[in-house]
Amino acid sequence: MPSDPEFMKIRSILLKHHDYWSNAIPLIASENVTSPAVREAAISDLVHRYAEGWIGERVYPGNQYFDEIEELCLKLLKELFNAPFIDARPISGVVANLTVYTAFTKANDKMMAISIPVGGHISSGPLKATTGAFIGGTAGAVSRLDVSYIPFDRYGLNIDVDKAIKAIRETKPKIVQFGASVFLFPHPVQDLTPIAHEVGAHVNYDAAHVAGLIAGKQFQDPLREGADTMTTSTHKTFPGPQKGIVIASRNELIEKIKAAAFPGMTSNHHLMHVAGLAVAAAEFKKFGEAYSKQVIKNAKALGQALYERGFKVVCPEKGFTESHTLLVDISNFQHSIGLGADVEHRLEKAHIVANRNLLPWDIIEKRNYRNPGGIRIGSQEITRLGMKEKEMEVIADFFESILIDLKNPTEVASEVSEFREDFQTIHYGFESSWKAYDYIKIA
């Protein structure tokens, strides 16, 4: 075993990290845990290799076996999403979005998307808002798109269809993008796509948060509802490695996507994660529908349990959510604990990991992302650990102890650790003797 002190220090920190997650309740809505089978593929020799170019047309030699892996990966993904073409070159969901923007827009074209303050993702963000004030963003800014926002019902947590129809006709964008990072309910794709096409807009659906629910047939079906393309990361409700994919609804879009993907947006496309994604897709083909159903059941059950304990879970009249995500207004704790950042830190001390999040009305209350009025909760990772509805009651009790009863978070952390003892293996995946957060040692 290596004895270098710096190596040993790095390893000791990694071991602490793995130990923390083995004893925590993971509720980040944008994360998940891969199976040991996926991790095995992701640390294969492919971590060292390049495969520029397309299957059978590589720039580098030595890729005959990787070609087989990528071909199988794409075949499985096309089956899951019922699509004629999928590209797995993007190394993230943001790069997948950037690929679509590159394929179907040019600089200064107009894009309409969900704004960040009401739950939109930064990859739809502009360089500047229409007001001229700097907002920030990633792919939208890099593409230098002129971004305006789809009208949104900030209290119903969904797009305002009537106002959106009017706005699309007035704005005449080149691209309309659905999807969000606070994605509680299906977006009205079927209602708005004909209007977007009427003005000549390309319609993309950013499925990063809900791709697993879509593949598991428990959410909407954007391609059948009219979207031209769908982009997604592969590590949220779809429990694969961190990567991105672009999905086309029809063959005539393929060449533009391919040109944008390579040599446009990617060179090396992280072959080890393609292999991991292939295994994740094989797992999802077998277990995905049951997993997706339980993810939504758990989210609804946790929302109800928190609501019954006095927490202001948004949209109770709509059943809280139709996805994996809950949004909780914690502004009533402002005087006892603080706002979102303070609540997030207090939960983290108790080994409960949920992130602060803007509420759609925070901008009215003059709150910002550094210390917003909400927290966001996701059920997808705890579902992967085998938790079901009865465990949602226990988790809600922990929230009550920490935030309402103001119990010492360190004491609650011990209770959380004891609770987690029964949930150490991956469910809805291929069997393994490895635990979910085991650290793989070389010696």
What are the residue ranges of the model-derived segments?
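PLP-dependent enzyme catalytic core of the Aspartate aminotransferase-like
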Residues: 297, 366-443
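Conserved PLP-enzyme active-site core in the AAT-like
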Residues: 68, 72-312, 345
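Flexible, glycine/charged-enriched surface loops at secondary-structure junctions
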Residues: 55-56, 85, 268-271, 288-294, ...
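N-terminal glycine-rich, Lys/His-bearing helix-loop that initiates the first secondary-structure elements
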Residues: 1-72, 194, 421, 425-443
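A short glycine-threonine-serine/GTX helix/turn-capping micro-motif
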Residues: 27-30, 259-268, 384-386
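Conserved small-domain helix->loop->beta segment predominantly found in fold-type I
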Residues: 281, 292, 296-344, 354-371, ...
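Short acidic (Asp/Glu) and glycine-rich catalytic loops that position anionic groups and cofactors
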Residues: 17-23, 48-55, 173, 254-259, ...
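A generic structural motif
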Residues: 153-156, 283-287, 332-334, 381-386, ...
